[in-house]
């Protein structure tokens, strides 16, 4: 029997003044590395400086010191985020038409940027309505501000200043927790305490405070705004907070205070904590009362979750015990050993977090249109398209990052001597089966999905529409997807007896929400065209996964290079004299994976953009007749590759190509410039190092002749550097091209 002292033990978890603050050291480029600190001999030095500045593993092998650097860097990151937010709010306060938009969001477009007339570029200030001229923004900030109850530009100023104060505070915290009071390694590895604090503090109290803000500030202010009250007449947020009678006039049960909460008489709160489902017909957004209810429920769940883990007192879950008890029938000793991996390798931990956060970000992308959370968001088509595209790209990059850090973990932190027969070892031992099967799946999906399109193009070209796969000829209906849609559409009143409408209008039914003559959302029909493109999605996702997973599973060794772990995370080839060993490093798999990620997400956002313009977005007449932007052409046009090129890319590029001389002309310039950036990448991807070194030496000779040669020797980019520059410009150029194409189109027609 274990006798525990009733007093919790006090652990000393910080070191005082571990590292002195030295501006002299910070001013010395490369101070973190003995080699780089010597200064440049060749131009490769500047590349190494950038490559290693944040690679804390390369500065020291002391896990505590690495942990402190990462922790401190997080505060720096938060500081930048607050600075960015402050800038957004400041633009809203200083350069925007927010107050005008608030008074008439259906006829006035959001703008928070006015171009100064320096060389005639004031043409970019288009008329967004209400007599305001500026650049139309598509970030969704106006909708968020309205939902949170901001009614004046003064409030935006105050928030911007508050964010600046927080940015300064975060910078200070980053310095303080590295130089003055740095946590010990034990603190970083105390997972139970971390879970309790993050669950109860960040998620629990965070959700609770947001729910409180929504109930006490957002709901009353939005109720007045929806009723058409002038924003200047509405009481200020602090008046609602300090004066309960004001709220009780809107929601009578407020006079009872918190009594119903603690006496479990919750139905008293039903007027401001609802369970309606569907969208508010006035704003086209989710009911704010539903959102407040959701955040209160989430807060309570997370507050409970934040008390589940064992810390100083002898009760609660212990993560190591949970993991080691987790055994399946086929997994041998189960999760034994995983705890040690995740508390000693931050790359392994980061990999999991990136995979989950990336997946979550993609889930957010899909919810932003199917359950639009903010007022007047659903009818702002430019913002809807931007939010979807943005979250898809971000989520995909995070998922590729997960593979990158999993591979770095395998190379740098994995210890095969202690990892015998645990789950990871078992996966590694049958990696050939995993990769070869996944490869087969990719080949199957590729030939079949592409084959369906090729069939349709051929039949269409030969004038045989009756032999095509389409909703009007040979149907390939997505029956499983339609079944799921139907199940959700029928849920209210049956499996979800408390809800009045379904979670999303997209599931089906007869409901349609339109705001100011524009469609906010309606049931989205799925047919043969969606079936075809979904299999392209499956194909591109599986190929991306194949490349990334192969990189992780073969990061340490392969039949081709058994000693790969000794070569490190990134290397060009396995030395001279071994042909056919280039592009095998874990880094190269990330590099190649990025291109397929780009393929995958491009198809997704093209599908979304066209589908919404064809089947959802549009105007509605007095008689209730809906006219879609592209007139429902998705179902018949997107079933051939020619249709994608002709009726999507070419037809919808007309706005960006013809934008010169209009307020959208900046998008035309970006469209052109981003194509150039993309093409520039090919120069790095298609040419070798030797070619450039030869050219450089000839140019250096000319400089020597003229006695203007630099002391630092010019060097061609290494193979890996060239690829890094190439993929960066490829992605940057491709994404910026798509951005210009989408926005010029949707701002012109939406």
UniProtKB/Swiss-Prot annotation:
* TM regions (residue ranges): 70-93, 156-179, 195-219, 291-309, 346-369, 385-411, 433-455, 531-549, 589-610, 664-686, 724-744
- Identify this protein by name: Photosystem I P700 chlorophyll a apoprotein A1
Write down the membrane topology: Multi-pass membrane protein
For this protein, the record's PANTHER family field holds: OUTER MEMBRANE PROTEIN, OMPA-RELATED, PHOTOSYSTEM I P700 CHLOROPHYLL A APOPROTEIN A1-RELATED
| A single GO BP | photosynthesis
Matching entries from InterPro entries are given as: PSI_PsaA, PSI_PsaA/B, PSI_PsaA/B_CS, PSI_PsaA/B_sf
Keyword flag 4Fe-4S: yes
- Write out the annotated subcellular location: Plastid, Chloroplast thylakoid membrane
Q: At which positions is chlorophyll a bound?
A: 683, 691
The gene is psaA
Signal peptide feature range = none
UniProt similarity note: Belongs to the PsaA/PsaB family.
- What organism is the protein native to? Pelargonium hortorum (Common geranium)
């Amino acid at each position: 029997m274990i006798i525990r002292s009733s007093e919790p033990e006090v652990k000393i978890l910080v070191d005082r003044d571990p590292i002195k603050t030295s501006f002299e050291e910070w001013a010395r480029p490369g101070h973190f590395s003995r080699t780089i600190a010597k200064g440049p001999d060749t131009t490769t030095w500047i590349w190494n400086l950038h490559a290693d500045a944040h690679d804390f593993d390369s500065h020291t092998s002391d896990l505590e010191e690495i942990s402190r650097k990462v922790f401190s860097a997080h505060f720096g990151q938060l500081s930048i985020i607050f600075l960015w937010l402050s800038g957004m709010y400041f633009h809203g306060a200083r350069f925007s038409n927010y107050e005008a938009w608030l008074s008439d969001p259906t006829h006035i477009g959001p703008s928070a940027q006015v171009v100064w007339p320096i060389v005639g570029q004031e043409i970019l200030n288009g008329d967004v309505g209400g007599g305001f001229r500026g650049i139309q923004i598509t970030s969704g900030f106006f909708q968020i501000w309205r939902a949170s109850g901001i009614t004046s530009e003064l409030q935006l100023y105050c928030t911007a200043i508050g964010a600046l104060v927080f940015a300064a505070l975060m910078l200070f915290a980053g310095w303080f927790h590295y130089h003055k009071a740095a946590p010990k390694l034990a603190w970083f590895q105390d997972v139970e305490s971390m879970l309790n604090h993050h669950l109860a503090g960040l998620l629990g109290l965070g959700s609770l405070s947001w729910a409180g803000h929504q109930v006490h500030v957002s709901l009353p202010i939005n109720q007045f705004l929806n009723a058409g009250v002038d924003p200047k007449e509405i009481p200020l947020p602090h008046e609602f907070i300090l004066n309960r009678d004001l709220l009780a006039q809107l929601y009578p049960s407020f006079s009872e205070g918190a009594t119903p909460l603690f006496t479990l008489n919750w139905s008293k709160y039903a007027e401001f904590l609802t369970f309606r489902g569907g969208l508010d017909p006035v704003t086209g957004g989710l009911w704010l009362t539903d959102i407040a209810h959701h955040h209160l429920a989430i807060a309570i769940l997370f507050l409970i979750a934040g008390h589940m883990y064992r810390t100083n007192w002898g009760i609660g879950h212990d993560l190591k015990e949970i993991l080691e008890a987790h055994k399946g029938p086929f997994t041998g000793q189960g999760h034994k050993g995983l705890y040690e991996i995740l508390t000693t390798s931050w790359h392994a931990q980061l990999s999991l977090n990136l995979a989950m956060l990336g997946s979550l970000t993609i889930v957010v992308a899909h919810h932003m249109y199917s359950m639009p959370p903010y007022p007047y968001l659903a009818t702002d088509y430019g913002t809807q398209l931007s939010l979807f595209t943005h979250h898809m790209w971000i989520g995909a990059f995070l998922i590729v990052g997960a593979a990158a850090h999993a591979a770095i973990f395998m190379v740098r932190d994995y210890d095969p001597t202690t990892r015998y027969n645990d789950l990871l070892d078992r996966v590694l031992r049958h990696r050939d089966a995993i990769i070869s099967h996944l490869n087969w799946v990719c080949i199957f999906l590729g030939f079949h999905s592409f084959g369906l399109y090729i069939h349709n193009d051929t039949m269409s070209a030969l004038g045989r529409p009756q032999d095509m796969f389409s909703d009007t000829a040979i149907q390939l209906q997505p029956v499983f997807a339609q079944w799921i849609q139907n199940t959700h559409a029928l849920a209210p009143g049956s499996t979800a007896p408390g809800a009045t409408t379904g979670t999303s209008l997209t599931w089906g039914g007869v409901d349609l929400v339109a705001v100011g003559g524009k469609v906010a959302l309606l049931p989205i029909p799925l047919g043969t065209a969606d079936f075809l493109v979904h299999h392209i999605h499956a194909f591109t996702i599986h190929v991306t996964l194949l490349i990334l997973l192969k990189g992780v599973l073969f990061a340490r060794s392969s039949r081709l290079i058994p000693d790969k772990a000794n070569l490190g995370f990134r290397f060009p080839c396995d030395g001279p004299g071994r042909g056919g060993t280039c592009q095998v490093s874990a880094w190269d798999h990330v590099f190649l994976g990025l291109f397929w990620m780009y393929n995958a997400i491009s198809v997704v956002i093209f599908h979304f953009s066209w589908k919404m313009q064809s089947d959802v977005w549009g105007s509605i007449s007095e008689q209730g007749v809906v006219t879609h932007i592209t007139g429902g052409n998705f179902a018949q046009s997107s079933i051939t590759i020619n249709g994608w090129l002709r009726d999507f890319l070419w037809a919808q590029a007309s706005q960006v190509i013809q934008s010169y001389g209009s307020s959208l002309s900046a998008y035309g310039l970006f469209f052109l410039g981003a194509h150039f950036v993309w093409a520039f990448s090919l120069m790095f991807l298609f040419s070798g190092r030797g070619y450039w070194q030869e050219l450089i030496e000839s140019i250096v000779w000319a400089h020597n002749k003229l006695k203007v040669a630099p002391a630092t020797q010019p060097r061609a980019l290494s193979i890996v550097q060239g690829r890094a520059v190439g993929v960066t410009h490829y992605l940057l150029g491709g994404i910026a091209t798509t951005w210009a194409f989408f926005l010029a189109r949707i701002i012109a027609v939406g």
